Amino acid sequence: MVYSYSEKKRIRKDFGKRPKVLDIPYLLSIQLDSFKKFTDQDPTGERGLEAAFRSVFPIKSFSGNSELQYVSYKLGEPVFDVKECQIRGVTYSAPLRVKLRMVLYDREAAAGTVKDIKEQEVYMGDIPLMTDNGTFVINGTERVIVSQLHRSPGVFFDHDRGKTHSSGKVLYNARIIPYRGSWLDFEFDPKDALFVRIDRRRKLPATIMLRALEYSTQEILDLFFERVEFKIKKDTLVMALVPERLRGETASYDIKDAEGSVLVEAGRRITARHIRQLEKTNTTELEVPVEYIVGKYAAQDYIDPDTGEVLVSANSEISLEDLAKLSLAGIKELSTLYINELDHGAYISDTLRIDSTTNRLEALVEIYRMMRPGEPPTKDAAEALFQNLFFSEERYDLSKVGRMKFNRRLSIPDDEGSGVLSKEDIVAVMKNIIHIRNGFDEVDDIDHLGNRRIRSVGEMAENQFRVGLVRVERAVRERLSLGDLNELMPQDLINAKPISAAVKEFFGSSQLSQFMDQNNPLSEVTHKRRISALGPGGLTRERAGFEVRDVHPTHYGRLCPIETPEGPNIGLINSLASFARTNSYGFLETPYRKVIDGVITDEVEYLSAIEEGRYVIAQANIEIDANGRMAEEQIACRHKGESTFMRAADIQYMDVSPQQIISVAASLIPFLEHDDANRALMGANMQRQAVPTLRSEKPLVGTGIERTLAVDSGVVVVAKRGGFVDYVDASRIVVKVNEDELRPGEAGIDIYNLTKYTRSNQNTCINQRPCCSVGEPVVRGDVLADGPSTDLGDLALGQNMRIAFMPWNGYNFEDSILISERVAQEDRFTTIHIQELSCIARDTKLGSEEITADIPNVGESALSKLDESGIVYIGAEVKGGDILVGKVTPKGETQLTPEEKLLRAIFGEKASDVKDSSLRVPNSVKGTIIDVQVFTRDGVEKDKRAVEIEEMHIAQARKDLGEEFKILEEGVLSRARNLLIGAGFTDAQIAALPRKDVLIQVIDDETKQTELEQLAEQHEELKADFDKKFEIKRRKITQGDDLAPGVLKIVKVYLAVKRTIQPGDKMAGRHGNKGVISKICPIEDMPYDEQGNPVDIVLNPLGVPSRMNIGQVLEVHMGAAAKGIGNKITAMLEEQRELAEVRGYIKQVYELGDEVQQRVDIDSFTDDEVLRLATNLKGGIPIATPAFDGAKEKEIKQMLELAGLPTSGQLKLFDGRTGNEFERQVTVGYMYMLKLNHLVDDKMHARSTGSYSLVTQQPLGGKAQFGGQRFGEMEVWALEAYGAAYTLQEMLTVKSDDVNGRTQMYKNIVDGNHQMQPGMPESFNVLLKEIRSLGINIELDQA
């Protein structure tokens, strides 16, 4: 493998055994691709905005004399960029402008004669845009639209598993689900009649549907039944024989062959042998007794040729009298329906008998009554309703997917077709459900991923947009029909409000539009790759059963079987597997390597769940010989959803990678294969809650996916093009681009601005730090700057801690964690949290609120941190209760006495008519002010601070753009100098020229002169561009803000809080091993090894066996080896050993392992590169052990040997307090520990007095409401058990809801009288009222 300069700084030793066939695809593509399809112009009009417009336009007036046609659309440029939108609290969106054409037809002339055409561009609201990282900024906050897993449109066959009817009979049903429109269900009842339901309303016999589709009784019977033909003889009947139909029946008469010999005697069962004999003798007719036909059903109407009377009607039961009538009328032939109990049921025949309708109109009326009960049906209304239900393109759409699924399920060869249903479609569904009831076909599995599809952002946004357009359509149609159209333009017809409202509602408040989880890069990526079965059109938590939540065989490689929330949403919210993607229909597919005649190729194909069932697929971990053939005879593989063994020759595909089945979060867990699934689930979920630490540290034991994740998450800065680093400071990196990557006519400079100390959605800190230095070569894709939780481009969620597994005085009982004081001293788990506090000045009825430093009844000391505008300084250290922004609110005018009026007149206005409503620091918070933003309404005068901030921003913008210009200008000038040198100028001559004069020199060489002129032009363009950019920036900064109605000014104060680790904080490893810190122990008391090095953390060994997450023990051993190797390299460098020796040792480490694929060629490194690598490996050599393909026990032992550690992984430890050796050796090593976002500071809370609930008068609950501690039923039992009667009494009265008692007690305490008199608790009065409301009067007697 070839490494770039920056990748050589630190290389992960990879223990993966399998070659990499396919890189993990871009992790956010599901979001970005979907939204791109929505906004991009699509000439075919099959998706996105184009499809929405085409489905609604043209809109015709009711009279047909005018119509509004759609021509094209274009999205404008957003006003503010993403960062500006976040600061200002507005939506990052672009205006949508649509070109519409209004066509007026001439009423008098022939139809279709155009009288007038008007074209105009119409504004149709703003469309929120997706940022580069797959998020949306809505009202200043980043949100993610989660993809939804819903039932695919199409037709599904199912049964009720015998739960509906008490007999336990299985009732089959079929359901046609469109993409939009009414659902159509067919179902059997316990008597085997077929019924139909529309939109889950009351059921009707299914034949009503057929009659409404213009089928007669005769046609219905012919569609669903075969016939049995009889010839009527004098005393007997001759039946046309189809031998196959007799199988399994009991002969009720002697069956004779053509010669007249008896084949089957009466009363005997007819077997396959008898049928073969009948076929052999070519028997085509069979004489049967007359009684045989009794009870059969006529296949058609039989009419007396003379009188026209119906003798036997179709589907009626035939009796001997009927037969006599037919004989009399001279009818010689009779057809009956072929029905048998086994596999040709009489379902439709029975249904026709309970169907009360006889013709189409009656059927339509019946359907109308069911859909619109209580409305009087008319012929036209019934006709229109039925037509609109399933046959109108406006109301019903199966969609492309639905049609494909429908046709494939019913074995119709074509995948394309109409979006509405046809008569044939409905008949085919009825035939199929009867086919299933007869036992010829299977029902569908609705949890199969071939029957569930993904709806992503683009599709959902398109649907919402269409909803808005449909609302507009109604209004437009009315306006086209009214008024004088000659005067109107398209702009006057269209009101963009409904469209904006629909889009805004979707992005702002849909269940699937979620506040982005921004704890760390992993939580961002996972949130964007989440697949939810909830949401509009999906399931609900309460109704979802066990089957839907369970792991299905088709999840393999598509949805992760591990990562799902614990709790009520388990199994309903899933995560996309690492390599999965959606196909054009929205079904999930996963990649496989093709296998041809037992040889594994590198050709990769993506298969959906439907296609996968047809093939035999081997796992990724099968043995392969040197020629790429499978080494074993019998191969473990999957076929039709079952795991089985097959011969190598039968294998058609093979997995791409062992990590294929799991999500990115799960594939971050090293030694995942040794962990129990439940704990792996917790591990995957808890990594998302890790808070970025002050100094990120890469995991010593990783899985090799860390870099991919960090880069794809978008938190690191990645080089767009190769070149050399020209300039670096804390907030900017400048790269001089390689000549061969330049676009013609550009300066060849890439400038990367870094994000500094901004607040994330979870109040953690987002900050980027450069990780390259001036002069370094850069290639495209190199990491230039680290973001939160990344270290040299690797994801780094926690810290490597030295761990010992041993009990320690009960401080690690029940998963508690004992940590060393050194961890806190070195700030290993110190995190920065940024809080945003807002102060809003409003216009009230009594006058406007004012932000000022002149606050009534507040001492000087409280105002010491405010400036003259009443806003806190940046850099001020503040604590709970300090004023951040001074604000006064007008009070209601009070009647003044004459004396007060006189005093006022003499001494001027006193501050008695305003009250203090300043923004103060919340009680439990202590921190530093890092930023202040002031937003002022348009037309309101800006205060001094706002002007200062504005000037600062303008100066900063000028400086940034100026530096950018200077860098770009230097790029142009240096190229001009090179030209001049090439044209014969000397360095001295060029140095003597004034800086800008380089561009105006005259050269003899004409081509070079032209090039120089082009550079001069480019320089002018740069200057003009700079002025323009600066002007735009200045205008943005100085313009007033668009604030909510009634708001005059908003001041936002950003407060940085540093949180060190402390008892009560929650920590976890990556294997689901979580715990709470019980004690921070002095370094000298911690257990230490023979060299005197104390451990950092002591964990309880009892946390491992019952949880079955052995991966953590292996991680500790491997971590010990990795760190040990780092220590050895450190020692070598400190002793200044020969570089060859260092190189040899590093090479030995990277070469270790049996069949390791990713070896590193250390020999090709230069001495400098080896030295830099060694320096970066001092802290330990990072290791990758991919999931299901990781390091083996033998390799861990080899690593421990290389590090000079015992291969048992255990050390002698000594007690820090006594110095005595512990009885047994202890497992000591390095584990990657995370600090989770469940901090004790956010949870710790106490209350003295506060707010009470209105009804019960008990204190509220929870920190947010400043509530009390609940003293529940069990706590009452505890006090009862101790007989602590008085304590219990005060708990239930004065400390809870005895209103008079508690106020009296407060007064007593103030007076220094520590007495209490309990009274009646309010909850007792509530109980009395409840009982009285039931009509039982209770009166209390005075005791």
From Swiss-Prot:
It catalyses: RNA(n) + a ribonucleoside 5'-triphosphate = RNA(n+1) + diphosphate. It is an enzyme of class 2 (transferase). CDD domains: RNA_pol_B_RPB2. Keywords: DNA-directed RNA polymerase, Nucleotidyltransferase, Plasmid, Transcription, Transferase. Gene3D superfamilies: 2.40.50.100, 2.40.50.150, 3.90.1100.10, DNA-directed RNA polymerase, subunit 2, domain 6 (2.40.270.10), RNA polymerase alpha subunit dimerisation domain (3.90.1800.10), RNA polymerase Rpb2, domain 2 (3.90.1110.10). GO terms for cellular component: DNA-directed RNA polymerase complex. GO terms for biological process: DNA-templated transcription. Belongs to the RNA polymerase beta chain family. Its EC number is 2.7.7.6. This is DNA-directed RNA polymerase subunit beta. It comes from the Bacteria. Pfam families: RNA_pol_Rpb2_1, RNA_pol_Rpb2_2, RNA_pol_Rpb2_3, RNA_pol_Rpb2_45, RNA_pol_Rpb2_6, RNA_pol_Rpb2_7. The keyword Transferase applies. The keyword Aminoacyl-tRNA synthetase does not apply. One of its GO terms (molecular function) is ribonucleoside binding. The RNAP catalytic core consists of 2 alpha, 1 beta, 1 beta' and 1 omega subunit. When a sigma factor is associated with the core the holoenzyme is formed, which can initiate transcription. SUPFAM superfamilies: beta and beta-prime subunits of DNA dependent RNA-polymerase (SSF64484). The gene is rpoB.
